[in-house]
UniProtKB/Swiss-Prot annotation:
Native source species: Bacillus thuringiensis
InterPro entries cross-referenced by the UniProt entry: Papain-like_cys_pep_sf
Function: Possibly involved in pGI2 replication mechanism.
Keywords: Plasmid
Highest taxon listed in the record's lineage: Bacteria
This protein's name: Uncharacterized 30.3 kDa protein
Length: 270
C-alpha cells in the first residue's frame, strides 16, 4: 500500500512538474509595449485605434489566426506571437496614396474600375491559417493568381470570381499598381509561367504547397504574399523593384518591401 502511495505521489509530482514547465514555456505577451511599438513605427495611429480596440482585435482576430496556424502546422519554423504580430504589421492595413492613371485600353473590370495585369491585391476579407489578410496578383488582364490557404495550393480565378469571393460587407480590397506598365506585364507573365502554367495556358501544370517559412527566395512551399513578392522580385529582372529583405513577408507588410522608386500606388479601394 505504501509503495502504491509513493508511486501515486511520484506520478502527481511528474504531472505537476510537466504542467509548470509548460506554463513557464508559455509566451508572455506585453500588449501595451507592442501597441506602443506599433505607434512609434508609424504603423498604428492611436487616434484611430485605441489600445482597448487593438487589444480586442488581438484577442478576437489576430490570436485565433496565429493559433490556427500552429494547429494546422503551417509554420515550418518556430515563430512566437510577438514576432508573428510584428511581421503582420501589427494587424494594420497598409497605407498608400491614391493616384489614378488614365487608361483607355480594354481590360478586366470590376465595379466600374479597370483592372490590369500586374495589379496587386490586398484584402482583409479573409485570413489564411497563420496570416492576417490576403494578397494576390493579376497574372493576366482577366485573371488573378493566389495561394488561398493550407491544403488548397496555388489557384487562378477570373477577375470577377476572385472579386466576388473576397467582396464582403465591412471588408475592403485594395488594388495597387506599378506606374511602369511594361514592368507590370513582365511581372504578371513571370507569375503566370512560374506559379501556374509554364506554357502560359489555362491548364495548370505548376503545383505549389502552402507553408510559412523564412526561405523567402525558395519557390516551394509558399504562401499568398510570398508568391506575390517572388513574382515582383524575380519577374522584374535587373530592375531594382524590391528590397532584398529576408524572413517572412506578410500581406500587410508587402508594399513596404518595394524600393522607393518603384513603390506602387493605391489606385482603388473596394
Amino acid at each position: 500500500m505504501k509503495k502504491l502511495l509513493i508511486s501515486f505521489i511520484a506520478i502527481l509530482f511528474f504531472i505537476c512538474g510537466f504542467n509548470l514547465k509548460a506554463f513557464a514555456a508559455e509566451e508572455i505577451i506585453d500588449y501595451q509595449s507592442l501597441y506602443n511599438q506599433a505607434i512609434q513605427e508609424g504603423v498604428l495611429d492611436q487616434n484611430s485605434v485605441s489600445y482597448n480596440e487593438w487589444l480586442k482585435q488581438n484577442k478576437e482576430e489576430f490570436m485565433p489566426i496565429y493559433q490556427d496556424g500552429l494547429k494546422q502546422g503551417v509554420f515550418l519554423e518556430p515563430l512566437s506571437y510577438n514576432e508573428w504580430l510584428k511581421l503582420n504589421n501589427y494587424g494594420q492595413a497598409p497605407t498608400g496614396d491614391i493616384e489614378l492613371f488614365d487608361d483607355v485600353t480594354p481590360r478586366g473590370s470590376w465595379g466600374g474600375f479597370t483592372l490590369k495585369a500586374g495589379d496587386i491585391f490586398i484584402t482583409n476579407a479573409t485570413s489564411s491559417a497563420g496570416i492576417v489578410g490576403h494578397a494576390a496578383i493579376a497574372n493576366g488582364d482577366n485573371y488573378i493568381l493566389h495561394m488561398p490557404g493550407a491544403g488548397q495550393g496555388n489557384q487562378q480565378l477570373s477577375t470577377s470570381n476572385w472579386m466576388q469571393k473576397y467582396t464582403a460587407s465591412g471588408k475592403w480590397i485594395k488594388v495597387y499598381r506599378l506606374k511602369d506598365q511594361t514592368l507590370a506585364r513582365d511581372v504578371a507573365r513571370y507569375a503566370d509561367r512560374n506559379f501556374y502554367s509554364t506554357t502560359g495556358s489555362a491548364t495548370k501544370n505548376v503545383y505549389l504547397d502552402y507553408g510559412i517559412d523564412t526561405h523567402l527566395y525558395q519557390k516551394n512551399p509558399t504562401y499568398c504574399s510570398k508568391l506575390v513578392f517572388q513574382a515582383l522580385y524575380f519577374g522584374s529582372g535587373s530592375r531594382n523593384v524590391m528590397q532584398a529583405v529576408s524572413g517572412i513577408v506578410t500581406p500587410y507588410g508587402l508594399i513596404d518591401t518595394f524600393t522607393s522608386a518603384y513603390r506602387p500606388s493605391l489606385v482603388k479601394t473596394y
